[in-house]
């Protein structure tokens, strides 16, 4: 994960649109004194520890819930897409950040604005990527069961 000062070179329209908003916020800060914080989420994952909030999709596409459904017998065998990525184990790598950490980051961003005028952007990730196979191995270790895939 690059730090906030790392060059920003979006590779797709989605990324370009996010960078465009950051530039608009910077322009609004310079022109009108509008203070802002843009939070750059990486891959949000998880649920509240008390289970009050979390993901619930009729058609689940996220890796971690599908791995857990598969290992716990609540769904079909996991389908792993791609095994030829230029990564150590050939599977895709993602930097996951827990939803409760994201919620805390929002509160910290509001506090930050109290003493830091202008437009700011912060990366919200854990700083380390995890491959699909690493996620599968972690689920197996936590549950004590092999993930069918």
Role assignments for model-derived ranges:
Residues 64-149:
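C-terminal substrate-binding subdomain of Rossmann-fold SDR/epimerase-dehydratase oxidoreductases
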Residues 40-45, 82-84:
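Short, small-residue-rich loop/turn micro-motifs
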Residues 1-38, 43, 50-62:
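Catalytic helix-loop patch of NAD(P)-dependent Rossmann-fold dehydrogenases
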Residues 3-5, 45-48, 116, 146-149:
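A short alpha-helix capping/helix-coil boundary motif
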Residues 48-51, 87:
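Alpha-helix C-capping/helix-to-loop hinge sites
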Residues 22, 49-50, 114, 138:
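Amphipathic alpha-helical interaction segments
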């Amino acid at each position: 994960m690059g730090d906030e000062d790392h060059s920003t070179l979006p590779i797709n329209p989605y990324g370009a649109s996010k960078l465009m908003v950051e530039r608009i916020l910077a322009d609004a800060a310079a022109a009108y004194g509008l203070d802002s914080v843009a939070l750059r989420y990486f891959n949000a994952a998880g649920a509240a520890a008390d289970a009050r909030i979390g993901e619930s999709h009729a058609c689940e596409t996220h890796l971690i819930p599908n791995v857990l459904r598969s290992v716990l017998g609540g769904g079909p065998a996991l389908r792993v897409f791609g095994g030829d990525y230029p990564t150590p184990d050939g599977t895709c790598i993602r930097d996951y950040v827990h939803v409760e950490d994201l919620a805390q980051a929002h509160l910290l961003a509001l506090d930050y604005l109290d003493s830091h005028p202008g437009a700011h952007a912060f990366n919200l990730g854990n700083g380390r990527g995890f491959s699909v196979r690493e996620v599968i191995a972690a689920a197996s270790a936590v549950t004590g069961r092999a993930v069918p895939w």
